[in-house]
């Protein structure tokens, strides 16, 4: 067994990628099938999985034909990208690196690996369990003196989960995990040597990668194979290695894309996989990269058997098999992908053959450190590698650890905290490496965000409107729209498979809800959610009756002010028209002084609450959120600060290094009173990952909100609907909220948020509905009242999104609260809402009186106002 008794693998709670087929049959590679595939390759047609598997069987003249097609694709890609070496030739790139083996311990047991060992063997040879900081820095410094610019951090997966000695080593030095140690050492390498960390710690969760992104321009993890057969079958390469589950590795690859991390991945050739499984692996990488654009290079690595391993007797990958796989990788992944092959695992002549097969990158090559994964295979000397490359008609050109297009894209891909280190080493024109040695630079949080951009947007949005229809990079910021639309079609097909609801179903569900509103089955709730006509009237009447019994006839509201302190954001929420990139015509950031000024203005106008939310600006300093709270409390001590969505909290936690609980307590101590339960959208990841590229997963939203409640920070709860969702998702979302409320009791209200579509990128791309119908609005508000009965008493309706008349309809169908006066509102208005951004107390009172109900001002948490 890999784990010590009583231990379990570290949980990775983020969304799980559906498992692929356990194995894939290799199509019969007849001569005619191969001829057809080779013809398609010559024509530049992308090969599907079966065609790719057939192509991998090419040998002799057929292999030469295949490689020639791949080389043409590679050259066309380099030419179209304008990539040239200093001498004007097409480049083949490499990264001059040092290899830093942080630890040789691992919780896995891959049958071909000599990198990993056990604590006893390390002790026997006098080696530490981990490299000490001084050892890491010594390697980096010596590499810098030789012109190295990359520090490759390689290590085993989560050794502390298997080895108590590893956990003791970390705890003795103040680290709670290996990844925390890696992060700290990456910062020291940046500050003390200037080398750029490339982090290769294996499988990571969304949260872990978000934590590491600020300390490394790039990361990597070999996918290796999508073959479940190799993972599940005793005696095969990945059996007994929990981190080699293909679904888990695909999840890491996907989450890296969601976080916009330049990411290196690849496959191993010759570990027992079939050509069809190899082709499936390439297509899995292709699919992920197509959706997110984050795979910066794909390593095609040939298996080399090593002594003293379980696979010592397995033959090395054959060179023709290897070349065919490289060529197919180029043809499948296309002209824009960097295809990499390690030059130390082949001979000089084979290096030339790899170039002929479509390779355009040699990966990291070190003049100082060995390849600790393949220690028996020394790196070629750089002048020798340059000569081999030149013999094939190409120039050897040094790059940085992040490929040039990601370096040149800036903040969309490179975190501001390492961007200065990258700029110091990058050619500003090409994004390749400059001919300089690295020098240590401070790794620090950005300075306090000052006032910039269109700071009057809160007022001008109602008079002048937007200066631009969308953010500047709508074509690239949200991933591949074709892939997104495919996901939407899958969701629509699932909705279409829902059983037809008959009037008798709704009637039976109504009778059940009348007896026990909170005790119906999901099927009954779904019947209520899909009701229409007279049946919908009956559902709304039941909801209105429950509202009256629960909270009475008063229509409540809070006098508050929205303060959206910045709209600069790179998260990539596809539904959001508020987010802008720095420098966009409508982008802005408020200083803490301006936020405090607006809080004072709100106080003078009678407000008891400010609601502060903003975009996820990577330049917001680590103290930024607390600074905003303190500024408001210093100016208006009595003001209730309702601020920061779970996404903002996740961002703050990532920046700070604190746990969620510690960060929330620190904000509470700074003066934070409650948090908005926004950033929920739909709490179902199959919908969530269509709506957003990089927002926190459902599991983390739940953890943050639950923890907030536990430390005394109550929250609202929300659901945004009417985009790519269906009633089944509404029921599921409300069930999640019910479960949290049962455990914490921390929700103050529920707020249904109709999707405002007009300027939403998701809608403009043809992937979303034009918002909910009036039937949907009525059904959601009524369903919420019924399902949340006895748990959440306050159901709010949004006059900003619905307008006065439809707001009144919702108040007669289960809702009892109008939200707030707002004073300013830019998120819905930038999306295209036409119902204004502020209401006076008199106007909100008129909404209630228009349906014969009294209006009453409340506090944020619905306690009575002080006299």
UniProtKB/Swiss-Prot annotation:
Residues 532-865 are annotated as: CofH-like. The keyword Iron-sulfur applies. Keywords: 4Fe-4S, Iron, Iron-sulfur, Lyase, Metal-binding, S-adenosyl-L-methionine, Transferase. One of its GO terms (molecular function) is 7,8-didemethyl-8-hydroxy-5-deazariboflavin synthase activity. Pfam families: CofH_C, Radical_SAM. Gene3D superfamilies: Aldolase class I. It catalyses: 5-amino-6-(D-ribitylamino)uracil + L-tyrosine + S-adenosyl-L-methionine = 5-amino-5-(4-hydroxybenzyl)-6-(D-ribitylimino)-5,6-dihydrouracil + 2-iminoacetate + 5'-deoxyadenosine + L-methionine + H(+); 5-amino-5-(4-hydroxybenzyl)-6-(D-ribitylimino)-5,6-dihydrouracil + S-adenosyl-L-methionine = 7,8-didemethyl-8-hydroxy-5-deazariboflavin + 5'-deoxyadenosine + L-methionine + NH4(+) + H(+). InterPro entries: Aldolase_TIM, CofG_family, CofH/MnqC-like_C, CofH_family, Elp3/MiaA/NifB-like_rSAM, F420, FO_synthase_su2, rSAM. The keyword Acetylation does not apply. Residues 92-344, 555-796 form the Radical SAM core domain. Residues 1-28 are annotated as: Disordered. Its EC number is 4.3.1.32, 2.5.1.147. Residues 93-425 are annotated as: CofG-like. [4Fe-4S] cluster 1 binds at residues 106, 110, 113. Pathway: Cofactor biosynthesis; coenzyme F0 biosynthesis. It comes from the Bacteria. [4Fe-4S] cluster 2 binds at residues 569, 573, 576. Binds 2 [4Fe-4S] clusters. The clusters are coordinated with 3 cysteines and an exchangeable S-adenosyl-L-methionine. Its cofactor is [4Fe-4S] cluster. Catalyzes the radical-mediated synthesis of 7,8-didemethyl-8-hydroxy-5-deazariboflavin (FO) from 5-amino-6-(D-ribitylamino)uracil and L-tyrosine. NCBIfam families: CofH family radical SAM protein (TIGR00423), F420_cofG (TIGR03550), F420_cofH (TIGR03551), PRK06245.1 (NF004884), PRK07360.1 (NF005609), PRK09234.1 (NF006687). HAMAP family: FO_synth_sub1, FO_synth_sub2. In the N-terminal section; belongs to the radical SAM superfamily. CofG family. PANTHER family: FO SYNTHASE (COFH), LIPOYL SYNTHASE 2. This is FO synthase. It comes from Mycolicibacterium paratuberculosis (strain ATCC BAA-968 / K-10) (Mycobacterium paratuberculosis).
């Amino acid at each position: 067994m890999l784990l010590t008794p009583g231990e379990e693998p570290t949980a990775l709670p983020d969304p799980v990628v559906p498992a692929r087929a356990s194995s894939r049959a290799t199509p019969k590679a007849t001569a005619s099938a191969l001829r057809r595939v080779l013809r398609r390759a010559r024509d530049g047609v992308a090969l599907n999985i079966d065609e790719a598997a057939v192509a991998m069987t090419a040998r002799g003249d057929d292999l030469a034909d295949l490689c020639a097609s791949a080389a043409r694709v590679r050259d066309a890609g380099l030419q179209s990208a304008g990539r040239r070496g200093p001498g004007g030739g097409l480049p083949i790139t490499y990264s001059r690196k040092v290899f830093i083996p942080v630890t040789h311990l691992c919780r896995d047991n891959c049958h071909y690996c000599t990198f990993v060992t056990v604590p006893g063997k390390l002790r026997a040879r006098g080696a530490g369990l981990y490299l000490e900081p001084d050892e890491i820095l010594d390697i980096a410094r010596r590499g810098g003196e030789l012109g190295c610019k990359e520090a490759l951090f390689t290590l085993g997966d989560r050794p502390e989960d298997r080895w108590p000695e590893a956990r003791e080593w970390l705890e003795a030095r103040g680290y709670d995990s290996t990844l925390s140690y890696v992060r700290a050492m990456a910062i020291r390498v940046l500050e003390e040597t200037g080398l750029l960390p490339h982090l290769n710690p294996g499988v990571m969760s969304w949260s872990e990668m978000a934590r590491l992104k600020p300390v490394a321009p790039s990361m990597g993890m070999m996918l290796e194979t999508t073959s479940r057969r190799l993972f599940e079958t005793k005696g095969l390469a990945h059996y007994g290695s929990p981190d080699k589950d293909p679904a888990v590795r695909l999840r890491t690859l996907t989450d890296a894309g969601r976080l916009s991390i330049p990411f290196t991945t690849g496959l191993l050739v010759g570990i027992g996989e079939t050509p069809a499984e190899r082709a499936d692996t390439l297509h899995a990488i292709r699919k992920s990269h197509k959706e997110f654009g984050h795979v910066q290079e794909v390593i095609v690595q040939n298996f080399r058997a090593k002594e003293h391993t379980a696979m010592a007797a397995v033959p090395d990958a054959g060179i023709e098999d290897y070349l065919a796989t490289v060529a197919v990788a180029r043809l499948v992944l296309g002209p824009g992908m960097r295809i990499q092959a390690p030059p130390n695992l082949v001979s000089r002549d084979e290096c030339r053959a790899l170039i002929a097969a479509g390779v355009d990158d040699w990966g990291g090559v070190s003049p100082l450190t060995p390849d600790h994964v393949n220690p028996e295979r020394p790196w070629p000397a750089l002048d020798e590698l340059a000569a081999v490359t030149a013999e094939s008609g190409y120039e050897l050109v040094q790059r940085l650890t992040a490929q040039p297009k990601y370096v040149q894209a800036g903040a969309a891909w490179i975190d501001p905290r390492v961007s200065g280190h990258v700029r110091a080493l990058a050619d500003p024109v090409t994004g390749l490496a400059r001919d300089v040695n690295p020098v240590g630079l401070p790794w620090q949080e950005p300075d306090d965000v000052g006032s910039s951009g269109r700071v009057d947007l809160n007022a001008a949005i109602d008079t002048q409107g937007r200066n631009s229809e969308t953010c500047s990079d709508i074509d690239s910021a949200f991933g591949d729209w074709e892939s997104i639309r495919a996901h939407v079609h899958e969701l629509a097909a699932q909705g279409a498979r829902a059983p037809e609801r008959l009037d008798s179903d709704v009637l039976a569900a109504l009778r059940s809800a009348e007896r026990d509103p909170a005790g119906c089955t999901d099927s009954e709730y779904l019947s209520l959610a899909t009701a229409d006509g007279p049946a919908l009237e009956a559902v709304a009447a039941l909801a209105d009756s429950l509202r009256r019994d629960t909270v009475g006839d008063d229509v409540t509201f809070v006098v508050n002010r929205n303060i959206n302190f910045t709209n600069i954001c790179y998260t990539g929420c596809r539904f959001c028209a508020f987010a802008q990139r720095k420098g966009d015509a409508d982008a802005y950031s408020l200083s803490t002084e301006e936020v405090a000024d607006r809080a004072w203005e709100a106080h003078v106008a009678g407000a008891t609450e400010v609601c502060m939310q903003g975009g996820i600006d990577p330049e917001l300093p680590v103290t930024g959120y607390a600074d905003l709270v303190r500024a408001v409390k210093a100016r208006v001590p009595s003001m209730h600060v309702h601020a920061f969505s779970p996404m903002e909290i996740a961002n703050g936690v990532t920046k700070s290094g604190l746990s969620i609980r510690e960060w929330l307590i620190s904000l509470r101590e700074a003066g934070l009173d409650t948090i908005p339960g926004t950033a929920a959208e739909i709490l179902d990841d199959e919908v969530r990952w269509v709506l957003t590229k990089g927002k926190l997963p459902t599991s983390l939203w739940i953890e943050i909100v639950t923890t907030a409640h536990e430390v005394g920070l109550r929250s609202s709860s929300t659901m945004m609907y009417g985009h790519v969702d269906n009633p089944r998702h509404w029921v599921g979302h409300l069930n999640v909220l019910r479960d949290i409320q049962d455990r914490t009791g921390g929700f103050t209200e529920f707020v249904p948020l109709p999707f405002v579509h007009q300027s939403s990128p998701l809608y403009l791309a043809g992937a979303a509905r034009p918002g909910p119908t009036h039937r949907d609005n009525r059904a959601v508000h009524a369903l919420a009242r019924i399902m949340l009965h006895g748990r959440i008493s306050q159901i709010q309706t949004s006059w900003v999104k619905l307008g006065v008349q439809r707001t009144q309809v919702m108040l007669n169908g289960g809702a009892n609260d109008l939200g707030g006066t707002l004073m300013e509102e830019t998120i819905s208005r930038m999306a295209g809402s036409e119902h204004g951004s502020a209401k006076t107390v008199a106007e909100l009172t008129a909404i209630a009186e228009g349906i014969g109900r009294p209006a009453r001002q409340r506090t944020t948490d619905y306690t009575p106002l002080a006299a």
